[in-house]
């Protein structure tokens, strides 16, 4: 699960870089939303992993 969260974070970072950089100006809003969604998924996954180990 943590692996998928990291993969999605990388995808969101790439989408964010393209969206924020002006290359794909029309999709900047979507990239911002995806970035924060996958960042939240990463945090949730990290917390769930820490709880399982405890």
From Swiss-Prot:
Keyword Membrane: yes
Keywords on record: Cell membrane, Membrane, Transmembrane, Transmembrane helix
Keyword Transmembrane annotated: yes
Chief place where the protein resides: membrane
Membrane topology: Multi-pass membrane protein
Compartment list: Cell membrane
GO cellular component: plasma membrane
Positions in coiled-coil regions: none
One Pfam family per UniProt: DUF1328
Record-annotated membrane-spanning stretches: 5-25, 29-48
InterPro entries named among the record's database cross-references: DUF1328 (IPR009760)
Family: Belongs to the UPF0391 family.
Name of this chain's protein: UPF0391 membrane protein Oant_1245
Organism phylogeny: Bacteria, Pseudomonadati, Pseudomonadota, Alphaproteobacteria, Hyphomicrobiales
């Amino acid at each position: 699960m943590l692996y998928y969260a990291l993969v999605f974070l990388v995808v969101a970072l790439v989408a964010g870089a393209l969206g924020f950089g002006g290359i794909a100006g029309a999709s900047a809003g979507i990239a911002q939303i995806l970035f924060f969604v996958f960042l939240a998924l990463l945090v949730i996954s990290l917390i769930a992993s820490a709880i399982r180990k405890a």
